[in-house]
Amino acid sequence: MQISPEILPRIIQAIAEAIEKNAEAVTQLDQAIGDGDHVVNLQRGIHALQAQSAEIGQLDWAVVMQKIGMTLMSTVGGASGSLYGTLFVTIGKALRDKTADLPAFAAAFAQGVESVKLRGKADAGEKTMLDVLIPAAQSLQNSADASISLQELLADVTHAAETGVEATRKMLATKGRASFLGERSLGHIDAGAKTAQLMIAAIAAVIASSGAPT
């Protein structure tokens, strides 16, 4: 299965709508244990991508992933800009000179997540976006190797992200401002994990509705 980059403007728009719809709720999560500016910072990057969406849809996957990464690095404040920038730049490099099929995307996404782990000096279980990205990447790789339909694959990845974000509620924060709260960080969902889950769900919904072949 191959999907054209021409789908990216729709994906970017869907992400923008999902973050805007949930902005107040996510900001409340962030204010509880974080800095409270996560959504504002993230939306700055999303708006920059929206402004470039027509151009982005005409590039090949390797180039466009790196372009998205550099845009996020330069426009999103806080740790999120650096981490998401690293994710997409690494994906782009991994796709260079590759056929952009599902196994290649799964492998590239996994490499991107590994780069985020290194850049953020974090891993699963530390109440960060990685608690969504890691299981989503694992699910994508597992599903890419299995003989299942595209709809099943997307459902599996979406479910993995949902399970991951909910799991942060019971985690003790060890990164960022939330880490200073100690046990008071327990009982709260991580805002960065939540926006990662929202974006994965938005991406999956657009691909599912595109009628792309398996």
Predicted regions and their residues:
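N-terminal loops that bind phosphate or other acidic moieties
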Residues: M1-T214
